[in-house]
Amino acid sequence: MSDSSITMALDMKKGRIRIHKNTLHILGDPQYIQILVNDATMQLALKCIDKPCSGDQCHKTNAKNLDADESCEFYSFALVSKLRELIKEIDAKHTYRLTNGKHVKSHGIALFELSSIEKVES
């Protein structure tokens, strides 16, 4: 099921990943999020996990403690670099948004089509 409120932002210049609070709520306020990229299907997934895992794409969320208008932010130049390899049109100086993520409840993930990435106009 696709949901327009499942969104995230990617700041290519700062290497910042911002997951909107509502996205975390839809995912059940997970303690940790693992960010996965599938090159073959051109998809990005946010996977809910209960314990920290190895690797630089696993992040603590503190989702339940966020204020109403806050987002959860992580920094990962490795992820940003990977996305720039996959999506040639991405400009390293801009911020992009992934919207209409699909909540796959049975797998505890939010799934985004990388083809739907949109540049955020300043």
Q: What function would you assign to each model-found segment?
A:
Residues 18-20, 25-51:
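Short, well-structured hydrophobic secondary-structure segments
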Residues 1-3, 28, 96:
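Short solvent-exposed loop/turn micro-motifs enriched in small/polar/acidic residues
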Residues 1-14:
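Glycine-rich loop/turn
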Residues 8-10, 35, 101-103:
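A structural signal for short hydrophobic beta-strand segments in well-ordered beta-sheet cores
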Residues 39-40, 45-122:
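Mature exported/compartmentalized surface modules and terminal targeting/interaction regions
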Residues 16-27, 76-84:
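Short beta-strand-centered segments at strand-helix junctions
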